[in-house]
Amino acid sequence: DPEMSRGLGDVYKRQGICNRLDRNTSGIVAAGKTMNGLQKLSAHFKDRTLNKYYICIVKGEITKRQLVNGYLKKDHSCNRVTIYKQLPDDILSDKNMPANDKNTDKSEYMPIETEYVPVVSNGRITLLKIHLITGRSHQIRAHLASLSHPLAGDYKYGDASFNQYFADKYFCRNQMLHSYEIDIPDMNIHVHTDIPASFINVLKGEQIWQPGIPEVLEALH
């Protein structure tokens, strides 16, 4: 709804909020208490001179740290993004690409970079800490889904049977994605949240919760 979007945008501006989260994503939202603080914070978000970390629960087992790159293209008509591994030139010359996409402006393919490290896994699921290097719309959700590791509870990019399992067993209705930590070295700012109770409930239910996980998450960068 364009009118609602404009209204929400006005609210964000009035409250001095610098970043937005995907709908149903929990966690840290940064805001400036003063105009000077807001300007400094906003500049760091714009210039990407800060580090943003998320935690999420995904399908399958991930055993090692990965830095993955690609390109993201958003379809505004349905508020959904598609991830491509290839460069735009390669995509636009691909014979298998849908005809209605062949004349798409290359600038619509935005470069993305996502780093993730596994914290704990039982083979069925993995708890990840994500370093969101670029901050595109739906980036974490779509990028991991494209790698066959969709987020639990993600009804836009996820796996239907996997989501149903979490809905039935853990009453999970939203994607298990949480903005966990922000680090701004230039401003000597480092903040992180507690692990959400919904995450702990799942990890305990899957018998992989360990008391030392909060300390592990804090140490991983």
Where does each model-flagged region fall?
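Pseudouridine synthases involved in rRNA/tRNA modification
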Residues: 92-106, 110, 133, 141-221
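Short phosphate-engaging motifs
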Residues: 37, 64, 136, 198-199
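Residue-level signal for inorganic ion chemistry
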Residues: 30, 56, 116, 140, ...
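A generic structural signal for short beta-strands and their flanking turns/coil linkers
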Residues: 50-54, 68, 112-114, 126, ...
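Glycine- and acidic-residue-rich catalytic/RNA-contacting loop of pseudouridine synthases
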Residues: 6, 38-40, 58-126, 142
